[in-house]
Design a protein with these regions (language model features):
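Hydrophobic alpha/beta core scaffold segments
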Residues: 136-137, 370-380, 395-406, 410, ...
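A charged, amphipathic alpha-helical module
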Residues: 11-124, 250, 254, 258-389
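Generic N-terminal leader/targeting and pre-domain segments
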Residues: 68-199
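Redox- and metal-dependent alpha/beta enzyme cores, enriched for Fe-S-associated oxidoreductases
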Residues: 119-121, 129-168, 354-423, 427-431, ...
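Internal, well-ordered alpha/beta segment that forms a basic, Gly-enriched binding/recognition surface
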Residues: 193-293
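Gly/Ser/Thr-rich loops at beta-strand to alpha-helix junctions
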Residues: 125-134, 206-214, 356-363, 449-456
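Extended, charge-rich low-complexity interaction segments
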Residues: 178-194, 258-279, 406-428, 501-520
């Protein structure tokens, strides 16, 4: 048990079961802080489950059982962290946990099977999990809620096996088994009648791939034909960097806004939109500052601390919740303090890596494992390299027209889609630009075996890596399905490369092989 960074054998905390042996001792101050935040999380969970309708939902929906693992997920993402890094993680993750609890509460409030609050349901617009919620930035009286976010996306972060049942259900009904398991699981939830039913209407987007379009087709038909909920298909252009598609993209946003107004009776509020736009710009400036910091010898906000928070704040929040700007300020203050003191997250930094490709969702804390086990610093990842465009903040006729194009740009540049669509420049060329900017000596390239967009460029990635003399490590996975390649299977691909090619020994040998196949 150690206060100093890197003194503990973190692998010794693991068991063959679902939870670890004990909590980590981080020194008195950090241990008390971590325990206080653990109590805070337990308070959120207790407040959630005290409502009778949420107890009913726990018994009705299979995927709700995964939320018992919320504290364990936080523990996985704080392994080995001390000082400012521990506080950055809790500032981000605890806010995300609170936001997901509110999302669940709202879903069950309007759900016809659970709360059946019909008046509230009339103010709900259902949105895709993989969709930018920018189209809701001008509706202060409406709730843009995603059913897929808690049922599949967050569930797999909590429990690596959460989506397995729904993947199997989708395939039992004839859906192809070689498509991305994320939309397949989402379709399985709908087929299994395991999604809350509520809302005045729904907005679906053509993200992020053909598998998503397949899933949207299954889900939208059930919404329209069985539940009587009209669905708008927002078709964002694929060539999103081209100027000649932006007018079409803007018209799609106008059509989506008109659709929402028609089915909810609410009108777009420009004052509220520009409030949200200002908050988006604030968050963007902070994110750019953190990325600039990561280009130095003392990166501060990286790995899971960057990836999970960016996904939530950028795509799901879109400036609609002021608490996220407050969190940005706290995170930045902590990062600046650690940077001035030249602090490091681990006892040794050996390699600077760019993480590219579609992240293994059932093993998101892999980014922290890289630092703790091998001293590989994940400076940034593909899903965090999203739009840094400043949105127009002028509430004038000209500013309002520009705002429509800004919303369209955000929709085109949602996380993952902004790289898997748009041509080889955004996926291939910009990777090597980032390698130079961040002074990286290594690229860890996720090879999501069901993602055709990235797999088709395998050879081009290798050719460029050889040309530039960069270590390129392929890590194969199947996103939501740990049965195909397990967490240890993911780790082994790094272990083999580091030992055979780099001729290195791990910083913490206890982390090299973990028996976590049954772990949440």
């Amino acid at each position: 048990m150690a206060k100093e960074v890197g003194k503990d054998r973190l692998g010794d905390f693991y068991t063959n079961g679902k939870v670890r042996k004990r909590r980590e001792w981080r020194g008195f101050a950090d241990t008390m802080y971590d325990y206080w935040r653990w109590l805070h999380i337990m308070g959120i969970l207790a407040g959630f489950i005290m409502k009778p309708r949420n107890i009913k939902a726990m018994l009705r929906y299979r995927w709700m059982a995964n939320y018992l693992a919320v504290p364990m997920m936080l523990d996985r993402h704080t392994q080995g962290l001390r000082g400012e890094y521990l506080r950055i993680c809790h500032t981000e993750q605890d806010l995300v946990v609170s936001d997901v609890a509110k999302l669940l509460n709202n879903l069950f409030r309007g759900d016809r099977r659970i709360g059946n609050d019909t008046e509230f349901s009339k103010k709900v617009v259902l949105v895709d999990e993989n969709e930018m919620t920018a189209v809701m930035m001008g509706f202060p009286t409406l709730k843009g809620l995603s059913r897929e976010t808690p049922s599949t996306y967050v569930s797999v972060l909590l429990n690596q096996n959460a989506a397995v049942h729904y993947i199997d259900v989708a395939q039992e009904y004839g859906l192809a088994g070689d498509v991305c398991p994320m939309p397949e699981a989402e379709a399985g939830v709908s087929i299994d009648d395991d999604a809350p039913v509520l809302g005045a209407c729904a907005i679906q987007c053509n993200t992020t791939c053909d598998g998503s379009l397949m899933s949207n087709g299954v889900i939208s038909k059930r919404l329209e034909l069985e539940d009587g909920i009209p669905v708008f298909q927002l078709a964002a252009p694929l060539r999103h960097r081209e100027a000649d598609v932006q007018e079409y993209a803007a018209q799609e946003i106008r059509n989506a806004i008109a659709f929402i107004e028609e089915h909810t009776g609410e009108k777009w509020d420009w004052d509220y939109y520009f409030e949200c736009a200002k908050r988006v710009n604030i968050s963007t400036r902070y994110r750019m500052d953190w990325l600039d910091m990561n280009k130095t010898d003392y990166p501060q906000v990286f790995g899971s601390n960057l990836a999970l928070y960016t996904e939530t704040n950028y795509m799901a929040i879109c400036g609609k919740i002021p608490e996220f700007v407050e969190a940005d300020r706290k995170i930045d203050a902590l990062a600046q303090k650690a940077y001035r003191a030249k602090k490091k997250m681990a006892k040794e930094y050996r390699h600077r890596a760019i993480i590219w490709g579609v992240q293994s969702h059932f093993y998101f804390d892999f980014l922290l494992w890289l630092v703790n086990c091998w001293g590989i610093v994940p400076l940034t990842d593909m899903l965090s390299m999203v739009s840094t465009k400043t949105l127009c903040e002028d509430n004038t006729p000209e500013g309002r027209e520009q705002a429509i194009y800004d919303i369209a740009w955000l929709t085109e540049n949602m996380i993952m889609r902004n790289r898997t669509h748009g041509g080889y420049k955004v996926l291939l060329d910009e990777l090597w630009e980032y390698v130079e900017e961040f002074h990286a000596d290594m690229v860890i390239l996720w090879e999501h075996m069901s993602c055709k967009a990235l797999n088709g460029m395998h050879g081009q990635f290798e050719e460029k890596a050889r040309e530039k003399g960069i270590h390129l490590v392929w890590v194969t996975h199947d996103l939501f399905d740990p049965r195909v390649i397990s967490r240890q299977g993911v780790r082994d691909q790094i272990n083999r490369y580091m030992r055979a090619v780099m001729q290195e020994e791990p910083l913490d040998p206890s982390l090299e092989i973990l028996h976590d196949e049954h772990s949440w």
